[in-house]
Amino acid sequence: WLLFLNPDTILDSNSLFSLIKYSNSNKEHRLIGIKQLNQNGSDTNAYGLFLDIWTITGFLRIFNRIFRGLTYKKMNAEEISFPDWISGSFVLLRKFDFIKLGGWNEKYWMYYEDMDLCKRAKDLNLKVSLFKNWKCIHFHGESSRKNKTITVMSKTEVIKSAHIYIQNHYKNLSALSLHSILILSRSIDLIFGSIFSTLKRKIFVKCFKYWKNGLLKGYWSSNKV
């Protein structure tokens, strides 16, 4: 077994042993995540839907969840659920599956590498599972909020990583359409947000340069890798 665990997480005592024991007896579960709580005890919903035409904006994502029966309320009520992807802050999988998948995609500096791994797993018919009877505390986002410079960098990288994911998993017109919709939706948010926030203004400036290179040169990589 291999466990990828964020350093800002706390596992329940001995929970890993019982989780592995259960997983050894239920071999259909191949990429495994667990329930993640924040420091206040609230569920962080550390899973989601793949990025596509129906999930690329928040408005469309809500209707997609309802249509597919994948609302947080429904999925959190189940002991085991099967989201598209699980958070990379806790991923348990067998070593041979990790090798079969080719490991983590190092084109991502941060963010979306978990979605990418799960997408490749689904493409190989490997089941992605979320277990609610095991849990950890994840101090989510604490490291990215230490100062304004880190905040701007991390939020910019989230947007860049979304474009990298699109470039990795879509081709031709589909890729161009998704890139364009993502640019439009993020631009609207950042431009209007810039009126009241210097942080959003700085993020927009960085993203604008990135978008220009992407559209004109087809360059959708992160300069952090």
Tell where the protein language model's regions lie, with residue ranges.
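A short, conserved alpha-helix in the catalytic core of glycosyltransferases
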Residues: D84-K135
